[in-house]
Every structure is written in structure tokens, then in C-alpha cells.
Amino acid sequence: MPLNLPFSSPLKLPLPRRFIILILSASILILFLHTFAPSTLPPVLTPNLPHHEPDASYFSPSKWLPPILNPNAPTRPLEFDEDGQCLFLSPFDALSAAEKARARVLSLDEISPGIVRADAPPAEGTDADPDFDDEFSELSNATRKMPAGLTHPILGLLRDGEAKWNSMVTMQSQTLEQAVDVYMDRWGRRPPKGFDEWWHFAKANNVLLPDEYDPIMNSLLPFYALPIDTLKERLVEAEKIPETFTLIVHDGKVELKWNDDYSRDTWWASRPRADSQINLMEPFIKHIGTFRATFTIHDQPSILLDHERQEELLTAARHGKISTHPNELDRAEQNWRKACPPDSPLNKGEEELEAPDSFISSHLAAMDICQHPSYMENHGMLLEEKNSDSHPKPHTKLYPILVPSKTALNGDIPVTPIGKDGRRDDIGHDPEWNRKSGKLYWRGLATGLQHNKKAGAKWRQSHRERLHFLANDKSDTYTEVLSPVGSSGEAELARMPLRELGQYYMDVKLAGGNWQCDWGDGTCEEMEKEIDFAPKDSSERSNDFKYVFDTDGNAWSSRFPRLMASNNVVIKSTVFPEWNTNSLPEWYAYVPSKMDYSDLFSIMTFFRGTPSGRGAHDEVARRIALNGQCWVERTWRREDLQAYMFRLYLEYARLTSPDRDNGKMDYVSTQKKASKEADDVPAAADIETPVIDQ
């Protein structure tokens, strides 16, 4: 019996109406699936949803294969716990199965401190392999032909970055007693008086990494080799250094003393920085004792001892000895070679070549100027000569000066960022990840050095100018780029036009016109002719990009916490370790880049994929961006800045106290515990302090 429908069969409708009904039905189905089951649709039909290869060509299978049928499409993990606390995600888990398998057996070869490349596969790393360069191991940092089947080194860096972070978090002290034990194991002495009050403050404010304060003691250690009377003299002399201010803490109160009229009346940043440091003290000032701390008003460090003297002081301090020989002529110079060991690559004149297939594994080690001689020719602060007319004036004598940034060689004492009480700036409107551009973004002023024909004559080699020239190259130059081979885990070197790379991967420019330049000698005019300056952008502009670059200015980059707080992957290049660099996990919460930028296009190729749409790792990048946000939320709060400064002031109060060496400024919990610990670690009061002549 035929079925009688209350309406005409679509098959009996005119052909145009059939197409209309078909299109409407398909649209309704797509809309339904888009709302309730988006993973069943190919990414090309869901452009507003995240995709692990968003920049792939429309002819790429990944654009047409629904995620539910695509084994390479990673799942989306939870980003917050039930209390709204951000969760750290696993970038490594977002790799394909083939990439994970390769990464687990990958060996990374360190070619210089903090810099690695993938080790050649054993089966192919032989003389029988025509693609293997057996002279590679004898070269310092040179480019070579890639062995066939080589694993991409970034896979191993993702593996190691995650393991480093997980291990660090797991190993943190949970009790005051554990924290004391960790301190004594690291430094061979008891913590400072008031350590228990600091611990209670840290725990009450949920400080995530209470054991990671090594930069404090590393910077203070040389001062322990100075006799108390000598250190007292240095404190007085430090207050006479121009362009500084001193905080005088006594009986739970703080007094601000300006050490010159310029600092008080002229320099715009002086008052906000001093006030910010004072405001940070408020919750703990009653616990930090009595001391006088002198701060520079500048961003850059000023103390640079000769290597021999620095080692003498460190050796004496580590052995609990005192040096009475001053042996420190205060020369108004900044001689980096004298600050490095005689057998260092810098003093041996070793050449460090660009290498697109090597990457930073340990950023702290990679910042070592002595081990990376190329820095002397590609960073503004190292290119520029310093003398008695410089600001700040350089010193080769160990003065206790607190500073917002320093290199690993400088003798200054690092403090936390000090703008707006050290708080992160408001990041503004931050679009969803999939609505951001896949290019790398950077805008900045032409800072880094004074541009002139004298001390700043090499300004074209400075770090900011080089970045601009690299991204906006208009020549026919080719460069090598290490590219992923799909999602196989393999890598290949390819020569590509620098101009095309810049156009595809970069939105990077110097902005605001010439800056810090000499009009009298014609340098400003040269800058205007050679640099296509962009207009200044708002700080929110960087939020429109998945990848943002951060590099040094005259010193450290104050924009770093704001960039990390937004939903971007921060790619950072610097020679300045900061107060919390030890706790910043590479390739997990951010991506480090070498100072010569030779790895920059290789990094972008790994994450965004090749211009033809191959090998993108968008979900890996998204998770790194979220980890960066979470890292800032968990470790760069106002309370974290206070915890650091609280601990620094406790250490500083002991260091500068007349009772430094008699044990009265050490922490002991109870008389019973003090007696027990005295059997293992003698207090300074129980031993005669040896004196050595150095």
C-alpha cells in the first residue's frame, strides 16, 4: 500500500526546489553538529574552533578530516580545577604518537652551555652514512647537513621542559623543617633570623616554589668574604654613589634617603620605584630587622669585578673565610673579558657560528657571556663602551647596590620588578586563541645603547636593530631553516628566501622613530634612512597574535610579565637573568630564543608550520601559552614579589649586621634543635673565623 504523505515528496518537486531543500537540510545538520558535536566536522567548516594546524593549506588533509577521525588531533584537557585555579597542561601530550615515540629515545647533544641540537641516530651516525658529517663534533656551534631521519630537537626540549617543571614543583618543601634542611644543604649555613616568619608568610600566601631563591644568596655570597668593618665602609661609600637612593629600615619603619638631587628631582622613574619598594615592605617590615639598602635608579647593573677577584671572594665565602686584602681598584670601566676566566671561549677568541638547528635548553646557562662570545657583537649593552660619563657609572669594586636587572657576571644584588609595586599591567582585551594571527609580533623603541659614532658606533649590530632587519629583510638572501616533516617527528634543513620568511612569519618592527641617538654626528639621520619605523602600537596590540617576541631594551624587559599574562606564546631572547629565572621552565611556559636569532625561523616553523602548511603544532603552542598564563598567575603575584623581597631583606640584614659572624643573626627554632644542629653545623660563634690574605 503506498504511503500517503501530507505533503508532496521532495523528489516530485522541481529541481531548483530540491537543491534549496538539500542545502537547507545540510545547513541544519552542520549547525546541529557544530553546536553539539563539533569534532565530527572537518576543521574547514569550523573556522571559529581551535585547530591543531590552523595555518595549513586548504588542500591539506588536516583541514578536511574531522578531528574524531584524525588520530593526530589532540584532545582538549581541563584548564581549571573545580576551585577555578588554573592547571598546568602538557604540551608534550599534544604531540602525535610518532613524535612522542621519537622524543622518548631522543638524545640532545650540548654544543655549548645551555645550547643543544639533536644527536644523530646511532644507525646513521657512522662513516657509512653519506649524510653524516663526522667533523661536526669538533666544531663549536657550526651548521652542518642534517643526517637522514634525524628527530626534531624541539621534541626533546618539550619533553625535558615538562620534566624539569614537574620535578621542581614536586620537590618543594612542605614544612618549615624541610625548608631549613634544604637551605642548609644548599648553602652550608643556617637560614637568617626571621626565617620562620618568612616561611609562615610564604605558606599563608600560597607561594608555589618556596625553595627557589638561589639568586639572592648567589649575589650576596661574595660579600661574606669581606670583613664586617670593610663591608660597613662599602655601605657608606655606596650611599655616596650618584643616582641612587637608600632605604633605612629600623624598628619596623622605613625612611627614604635620596643620595643626589638628580635622583630626587629629575629622573622620572626614581620616585615611583622608591615608593613601590617601600609599599612592598608593608606586610613584613616588622620582621626584617635593621639595615640600610642602596638602590640604583637605573635599569642597568654597574658592578663588574675582575674574574680573579670574584673567584677569590667566592672561594673564601664558600669556606667560611675572610679576605682582608681589598685588591679592588675602582676603575670606571666595564671590561667583560677581564670578568671572564682566561680559558673561556670569549678570552680564547673562539668563533660562535649561527646554527638554525640548535636551540636553548637552559636559558640561564645560555646567558653566560663568557661561554658565548658572539654576544659581544650582537647585544647593545655589550657593544657600547662604558666610562666615567656613563649612566650608571661602572665600578670594578664590590659595592652592595640593589638593581632591577644584571647579567650573571655582575656583582649587583637583584630585586623584583618595581613598576606599579611590581604588579602586572592590565593586559586589556585578549581574543580567543583561534582568532589570533599566527605571526610573531613585536614592537619596541630603538633602545639598547646610545646610537652615535663613538661608544655606540656599532648600533646596527645591537639586538633590537638586528631583530628589525631580520624580520624586514628585502634582499635576495637565503637562510637555512629547520622544519618538521609533517607529524612524523623528523626534521629537515631547507634553504628559504629570508624575505619570504619575514613576510610569512613576522610582524616585527622598531617603532616611534629614532631614539637615543646623536643628531650632531648624523647618526639620527642614518637611522631614519635605514629603518622603516612603524607607529607606536598600544600594549593591547600584541594580544592579537599567538606568538609575541620579548627582547632586552637598555636592560631587562619590563613588559615580560604582561606578555606572559596574555594568551600568547612568549618567545624570549635575553642576557639578563631575573629574580625568578630559575623557576621559569623553558619549552613549557615560554620558548627561549638565542641571542643571534638564528633559531627564530626554525622555532616559528615548528609551531606555525611551513608556508606550505606542513608540520604545524598549534595545540602544543596553545598549551605553552596557557602554561605561561598560569605560571604568572601562580608565581608573579604581588605576594610572590613580597616573598622574594622579604627573604632578600632577611639575608641582607644578617649580611650587614655587626653580629653576622657570631650566630646571633642565624635562625634557630628551639634551643633543643639549635643544640642538635650545632653538632653537625658549627655556628659562627663557636669557631674562630680564619683570615686569609687575598
Swiss-Prot record:
One of its GO terms (cellular component) is membrane. Its main location: membrane. The chain crosses the membrane at residues 19-39. Residues 1-18 are cytoplasmic. Glycans are attached at N141. Its EC number is 2.4.1.-. Residues 661-694 are annotated as: Disordered. Disruption phenotype: Attenuation of cryptococcal growth in a mouse model of infection due to defects in capsule polysaccharide content. The general morphology of the capsule is normal but two main capsule polysaccharides, glucuronoxylomannan (GXM) and galactoxylomannan (GalXM), lack beta-1,2-xylose residues. GO terms for biological process: capsule polysaccharide biosynthetic process; glycosphingolipid biosynthetic process. Residues 40-694 are extracellular. Belongs to the glycosyltransferase 90 family. It is found in: Membrane. One of its GO terms (molecular function) is UDP-xylosyltransferase activity. Signal peptide: none annotated. This is Beta-1,2-xylosyltransferase 1. It comes from the Eukaryota. Beta-1,2-xylosyltransferase that plays a key role in capsule polysaccharide synthesis by transferring xylose to alpha-1,3-dimannoside in a beta-1,2-linkage. Also mediates glycosylation of glycosphingolipids; constitutes the unique xylosyltransferase responsible for adding xylose to glycosphingolipids. The keyword Membrane applies.
